[in-house]
Swiss-Prot record:
<dbReference type="GO" id="GO:0008270">
    <property type="term" value="F:zinc ion binding"/>
</dbReference>
<comment type="pathway">
    <text>Purine metabolism; 7-cyano-7-deazaguanine biosynthesis.</text>
</comment>
<feature type="binding site">
    <location>
        <position position="189"/>
    </location>
    <ligand>
        <name>Zn(2+)</name>
    </ligand>
</feature>
<comment type="function">
    <text>Catalyzes the ATP-dependent conversion of 7-carboxy-7-deazaguanine (CDG) to 7-cyano-7-deazaguanine (preQ(0)).</text>
</comment>
<feature type="binding site">
    <location>
        <position position="202"/>
    </location>
    <ligand>
        <name>Zn(2+)</name>
    </ligand>
</feature>
<dbReference type="InterPro" id="IPR018317">
    <property type="entry name" value="QueC"/>
</dbReference>
<dbReference type="GO" id="GO:0008616">
    <property type="term" value="P:queuosine biosynthetic process"/>
</dbReference>
<feature type="binding site">
    <location>
        <begin position="9"/>
        <end position="19"/>
    </location>
    <ligand>
        <name>ATP</name>
    </ligand>
</feature>
<keyword id="KW-0067">ATP-binding</keyword>
<dbReference type="InterPro" id="IPR014729">
    <property type="entry name" value="Rossmann-like_a/b/a_fold"/>
</dbReference>
<keyword id="KW-0547">Nucleotide-binding</keyword>
<dbReference type="GO" id="GO:0005524">
    <property type="term" value="F:ATP binding"/>
</dbReference>
<keyword id="KW-0479">Metal-binding</keyword>
<protein>
    <recommendedName>
        <fullName>7-cyano-7-deazaguanine synthase</fullName>
        <ecNumber>6.3.4.20</ecNumber>
    </recommendedName>
</protein>
<feature type="binding site">
    <location>
        <position position="199"/>
    </location>
    <ligand>
        <name>Zn(2+)</name>
    </ligand>
</feature>
<keyword id="KW-0671">Queuosine biosynthesis</keyword>
<keyword id="KW-0436">Ligase</keyword>
Length: 224
């Protein structure tokens, strides 16, 4: 039987690449997305398309309304998404504890289906400065996962994989292109419209556009 892995899938470029990488490593992949009250639903529509295109065995979308807490421009319409370029420090688009919440859901699903590997698209090179995308965070979460689960305490080690964490955006795009990822299906924009068209000026759009240019790969992003 093939090894199973849970892959966090937002619908964006990074997580699509990570799903393709997990497939290439021979895993039977289970894709997990979250409807957490983000500004638009087009990234979840993108996640559905990516999961189908890359052959995920199952794709689950979990509802968990983080708008009740707010604290981020992605979950609070009163806060504006920055459009002036990537700045120093942790930006207002950081969603409090989002990766920890999503990895915890993935961990629960992993135990339920007998998966021992979690994959997610954390990146500490071309990114917006999020604290839960750093190597030390990934290592700490893996320690937690093995202390907090039946599998872990019985010696069936759970691994938290962040295969693109040290890659530039250009390197990620080149790797995905080699694996056949169709980036036209992905949505990275923080404020995409209902058709998935990108704003072109938020941090995520700027980093994505620069990545395609540096990778010398045609950019299929639809801008409005």
């Amino acid at each position: 039987m093939k090894k199973r892995a849970i892959v966090l899938l937002s619908g964006g470029l990074d997580s699509a690449t990570v799903l393709a990488m997990a497939n290439a490593q021979g895993f039977e992949t289970y894709a997990l997305s979250m409807r957490y009250g983000q500004r638009h639903s087009s990234e979840l529509e993108a996640a559905k398309k990516v999961a189908a295109a890359l052959g995920a065995v199952r794709h689950e979308i979990v509802d968990l309304d983080l708008r009740r807490f707010g604290g981020s421009a992605l979950t609070d319409d009163a806060l504006e998404v920055p459009t002036t370029g990537v700045q120093e420090g942790i930006p207002i688009t950081y969603v409090p504890a989002r990766n920890t919440i999503m990895l915890s859901l993935a961990l629960g699903w992993a135990e339920a289906v007998g998966a021992r590997d979690l994959f997610f698209g954390a990146n500490a090179v071309d990114y917006s400065g999020y604290p839960d995308c750093r190597p030390e965070y990934v290592a700490a979460y893996e320690t937690l996962a093995n202390l907090a689960t039946k599998a872990g305490v019985e010696g069936d080690h759970i691994r938290v994989n962040a295969p693109i964490i040290a890659m530039t955006k250009a390197e990620i795009i080149q790797a995905g292109a080699r694996l056949g990822v169709d980036y036209s299906l992905t949505v990275s924009c923080y404020q995409a419209d209902d058709e998935g068209r990108a704003c072109g000026v938020c941090d995520s759009c700027r980093i994505r556009r620069a990545g395609f240019e540096a990778a010398a790969v045609p950019d299929p992003t639809r801008y409005r």
